[in-house]
Amino acid sequence: MASITLDNLVKAYGDTEVLHHVAGQIEDGEFIVIVGPSGCGKSTLLRMVAGLETVTAGQISIGDRVVNQLEPADRDIAMVFQNYALYPHMSVRENMAYGLKIRKISKDEIARRVEEAADILELRPYLDRKPRQLSGGQRQRVAMGRAIVRNPQVFLFDEPLSNLDAKLRVQMRLEIRKLQQRLGVTSIYVTHDQVEAMTLGDRLMVLNGGYVEQFGTPIELYDRPATTFVAGFIGSPAMNFLPATAAEGSVTLANGARIAGSGTAHGTVTLGLRPEHLLPDEGGPVRVRVELVEQLGANSLLHGQLEGTDTEMVVSMPGHMSAAADAVMAFTPTADSLHLFDPETGKRIAE
């Protein structure tokens, strides 16, 4: 196991810079998730750590070694990809052992490592099967087993669950987390799925357009998002953003409604309200004209517009509820649930 240091990393293709001064310290045994939309640079960053992409500027250290110039095979890492990349003509046992054979590990040691990994991943009954005889989840376990047998210092996961259906994704992400906790190996995991990121990561690095928007625990990102991008990306449904004016410890919405708050912000702001932090209240200041209601079973999502404006809003309410189209419902934000952002920079306004 080892720590990883990303020191002011830059990646450019010709004159086009795609990663901009990425920095972060990943502690020994930590599970870090790099999350962001397609094209934000997350897989490029992972491939730089792996040695599959060159570093334009900056430095990557694994443990006490700077690895910029090291080949992937010399970095003591193991990768698990979206594509399982299993050899179809080999059994599960042979697929898991292949990398060790290339490294000329003894047969006894190979057998021991393969069987140990198979027990961890509950693959022992399938060791003599071919990949075509396995389900998608079992194939992904084989790919993880192939990484485990190498006893690396670092695991790198590049969207490993993207090819699985929704139910299997939930099952496999729990298995990956339990596996990492059991082995204690420093891990970096890339995904575009914020729910996957929140449930897996000790900390999340949110990328947007090649820049790090925020690097912190899931709860830090949820409770105190540093920017409107993070606020809108982390949490489901996404945060509501309302144009407003702050003064004297309160916030006034575009329709004149006033919300009591705290802090010293003054002037034009963007008010962020999470859909789950709005409580029904007949005299509440946030009045929403209903367009439709989504019944999800455990909760209901009310879609509409802030009364008197064209600002779209979503409210999440527990249990079952119904409301006629064009009805107006009033809500009050829960205590300490107001998020204020600078409308020009998108950055959080200090409270």
Swiss-Prot record:
Q: Which Pfam families does the entry link to? A: ABC_tran, OB_MalK
The compartments listed are: Cell inner membrane
Example of a GO biological process term = glycerophosphodiester transmembrane transport
Query: Could you tell me which SMART domains the record lists for this protein?
Result: AAA
Residues reported to bind ATP: G36, P37, S38, G39, C40, G41, K42, S43
Record's keyword terms, sorted: ATP-binding, Cell inner membrane, Cell membrane, Membrane, Nucleotide-binding, Sugar transport, Translocase, Transport
- What's the domain of life for this entry? Bacteria
EC number annotated for this UniProt entry? 7.6.2.10
Residues in ABC transporter domain copies: 4-234
This protein's record includes keyword Membrane = yes
Q: What class of enzyme is it?
A: translocase
The record's listing under InterPro entries reads:
AAA+_ATPase, ABC_transporter-like_ATP-bd, ABC_transporter-like_CS, ABC_transpr_MalK-like, ABC_transpr_MalK/UgpC-like, Mo/tungstate-bd_C_term_dom, NA-bd_OB-fold, OB_MalK-like
| GO (cellular component) term, any one | ATP-binding cassette (ABC) transporter complex, substrate-binding subunit-containing
- State the similarity comment: Belongs to the ABC transporter superfamily. sn-glycerol-3-phosphate importer (TC 3.A.1.1.3) family.
Q: How does it assemble?
A: The complex is composed of two ATP-binding proteins (UgpC), two transmembrane proteins (UgpA and UgpE) and a solute-binding protein (UgpB).
Question: So what does this one do?
Answer: Part of the ABC transporter complex UgpBAEC involved in sn-glycerol-3-phosphate (G3P) import. Responsible for energy coupling to the transport system.
Protein name, UniProt field: sn-glycerol-3-phosphate import ATP-binding protein UgpC
What organism does this protein naturally occur in?
Ruegeria pomeroyi (strain ATCC 700808 / DSM 15171 / DSS-3) (Silicibacter pomeroyi)
Q: Which gene encodes it?
A: ugpC
